[in-house]
Amino acid sequence: MGDVALTIPALLSVVESHPEIHITLITRPFFASFIPAHSRIKAVGINLENYKGLMGLRKLTKQLSNKHQIEEVIDLHNVLRSRTITSFFKLKGIKVTTFNKNRSAKKEIISHQSNEKLPHVTNQYLNTFAKAGYESKLMEGPWIKPETKPQLTEFLSQNNLNSKEAKWIGIAPFAGHEAKIWGIEKIKNLISELTAKNYSVFLFGGGNSEIEQLNDLENKENKVFSVAGKFHFHQELALMKKLNYLVCMDSSNMHFATLVGTPVVSIWGATTPLIGFYPLNNEHLMVQVSEKNKNKLTLSSYGNKESENGYDWRNEIAVKRVLELLS
């Protein structure tokens, strides 16, 4: 989901710089729902279950050609399915430009053979558009501007949160893989330190297991609120926008908070920002192990590999380091 979210600043920047073009973004239905409304950007949600196999993708290409005035295709995904679709468009004589995933460079970074940082993924997307002839400068954020609806307004009112007496800190303690997660005990300690400062704390997550754990941490008397599973996605974004900071792992929440303009303190373990998926314009708030210990990390692109040498990065990242960035 994060890679789709990071197309948003690129798409907005391109249409801002090139008023002559219209963009149709083909993606999954849920992903289409968070693309900002724009007169020259149309997000089309496609259920890929309806287009299985080679013939299914050929059918999809035909339907897209018939329904939309496609004059050019830019593949920002560069996986087998998207390459198959673009091949069908090429057969129709349509120009195709493909995103370079820098697979070799990523492999060298992950295996500790290189420390050369890749450009941010959003800038890589912009480079792809530039290669197609649409050079653009990254426009300033925020890139998503969610409105506060009655559901969120009522929640804030019921919990006496209509005004800020002290900072509002969001915490999104989970990620897609365990090896990227700082740990619930660290989160508990962080919450204790924040509530001692009279800060309000908002806990973000999703899925039954995460919701259950966050509900256990909720303490309304101390202004610790679990919002997991309580709001529609866009209202979660509206709440994120109101925060002073979001503390998170390498996860989609990291990117969405950045897109709404909230400073992000990100904690890194089994992945590395060097491959370009760090929070845009928030590099100064990244928390990592020391330079001397980075080679001890067991890294992967997705953070799905546990330590292979017994080194646990969590032990090195103290609560105090995170607190210092929130002050």
Task: Please describe what each predicted stretch is.
Residues 1-327:
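Catalytic machinery of carbohydrate-active enzymes
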